[in-house]
């Protein structure tokens, strides 16, 4: 099981006697905490780190504290300021960065010094570069071809509201029908996610970064039929996404149906997925 890693954390630090002094390191972006008493004295707090860190690192930062990932940072901050059990505080350290402003700050860093970011944090550099390239392509890309009958049928299908069951399977056995080109074109639109398949853990982790998107799964011709991840297809369609990579979590999004489209050179294996879920569109 991968180590738990997160940016946002909640902590409870029990103590007796004088209030413990906390010395934050430069890795801490922001923290808020207060002295509370509910049967015993403790510090209740929230921490925002500059980057994802492991639970082990957090325990080194706050020895003896009980730590959990904060899934709702704003609510965690409010919880650390509740008056009912407060004795002293709250105290604050640093400046809290909301998720939107954090992205803007990162993009400003990238624009001001891309080569410096490339050396300091290659992973962050690649993510920022990807965001810039996607924005440019979205602004310039148009579909300059006549729609084939199957493409017209697909567009009419996805113009309808998605239901909680139907998986659209675009089938073209010969190649050259325009499946991959159309999948990439569709996913240039906001609210769509593209993948060429792969390991289930990688696919679910990538999708969990923006789990409200409609999905195009563009299966390469070289993929063997037995390697199709039907479990991933059904998890996304069922709106229960179980991500076990880096930050294990289960994402429930009941009631928010999305279109799931599979572009493939072979028909679905109905021994591995319910036949009545599949809508075939022939190229």
From Swiss-Prot:
InterPro entries for the chain: CRESS_DNA_REP, Helicase_SF3_ssDNA/RNA_vir
Keyword Cell division among UniProt keywords: no
Alphabetized GO MF terms: ATP binding; ATP hydrolysis activity; DNA binding; endonuclease activity; metal ion binding; nucleotidyltransferase activity; RNA binding; RNA helicase activity
Major localization class: host cell
CRESS-DNA virus Rep endonuclease domain sequence ranges: 3-96
Cofactor(s) the record lists: Mg(2+); Mn(2+)
Active site positions, chain numbering: 79
Keyword Nuclease appears in the UniProt entry: yes
Catalytic activity: ATP + H2O = ADP + phosphate + H(+)
Protein EC: 2.7.7.-, 3.1.21.-, 3.6.1.-
Locus of motif Nuclear localization signal: 51-71, 96-102
Keywords: ATP-binding, Covalent protein-DNA linkage, DNA replication, DNA-binding, Endonuclease, Helicase, Host nucleus, Hydrolase, Metal-binding, Multifunctional enzyme, Nuclease, Nucleotide-binding, Nucleotidyltransferase, Transferase
Motif RCR-1, residue range(s) on this chain: 10-13
A Pfam family annotated for this UniProt entry: RNA_helicase
Residues spanned by motif RCR-3: 79-82
Oligomer and partners: Homooligomer (Potential). Rep binds to repeated DNA motifs (iterons).
Notes concerning its domains: There are 3 rolling circle replication (RCR) motifs. RCR-2 is probably involved in metal coordination. RCR-3 is required for phosphodiester bond cleavage for initiation of RCR.
Family: Belongs to the nanoviridea/circoviridae replication-associated protein family.
Function: Initiates and terminates the replication only of its own subviral DNA molecule. The closed circular ssDNA genome is first converted to a superhelical dsDNA. Rep binds a specific hairpin at the genome origin of replication. Introduces an endonucleolytic nick within the intergenic region of the genome, thereby initiating the rolling circle replication (RCR). Following cleavage, binds covalently to the 5'-phosphate of DNA as a tyrosyl ester. The cleavage gives rise to a free 3'-OH that serves as a primer for the cellular DNA polymerase.
Protein name per UniProt: Para-Rep C7
Gene: C7
